[in-house]
Design a protein with these regions (language model features):
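Short N-terminal secondary-structure initiator segments
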Residues: 18, 53-54
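Short cysteine clusters
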Residues: 62-65
């Protein structure tokens, strides 16, 4: 065996190693995509109302204060499991009523509590956001958040 590495040996090791890790990366990317689309996301329940609720979530900047499954700001509570915490995850009508009542009667002046803005949402928008939060609550997320309180 030679003690000196030639340029061609170094080049072959570099290209071979690069190709190996590129193939590993592509395989893991394909696996992640397949897992997300086929296992973790329930696309069958992704209705127009859920999509509209996600759109409202984005345009109203809810993520600037709240988190969903750990993504977002930590200024206000996690909402990924809010329907389970409220006990309304089995009833879309109860979820709608609970969300609407909560957002319309935000308590003010409580020490240590931040005030949520009033968004002047219509019933259709409340329904869409509650459907989005119900859908988010149904995601198989490997027990995230780690506590029931979010």
């Amino acid at each position: 065996m030679r003690e000196v590495m030639t340029k061609s040996m170094a080049r072959n090791i570099f290209y071979g190693g690069s190709l190996f890790f590129i193939l590993i990366f592509l395989g893991l990317s394909a696996h992640s995509h397949r897992y997300i689309t086929q296992t973790s996301t329930d696309a069958a329940t992704l209705t127009d109302s859920v999509r509209h609720g996600k759109h409202l979530w984005e345009i109203n900047g809810c993520i600037n204060c709240h988190t969903i499954l750990g993504e977002g700001a930590y200024f206000a509570p996690e909402l990924g499991n809010v329907m389970t915490r409220w006990g309304v995850n089995d009833s879309p009508d109860d979820a709608f009523e609970m969300l609407k009542a909560w957002m319309q009667s935000m308590p003010t002046g409580i020490e240590g509590r931040r005030q949520m803005p009033n968004f002047d949402l219509t019933d259709e928008e409340f329904r869409a956001i509650s459907d989005f939060l119900l859908w988010t609550d149904s995601i198989r997320n490997q027990d995230w958040p780690p506590t029931d309180a979010g």
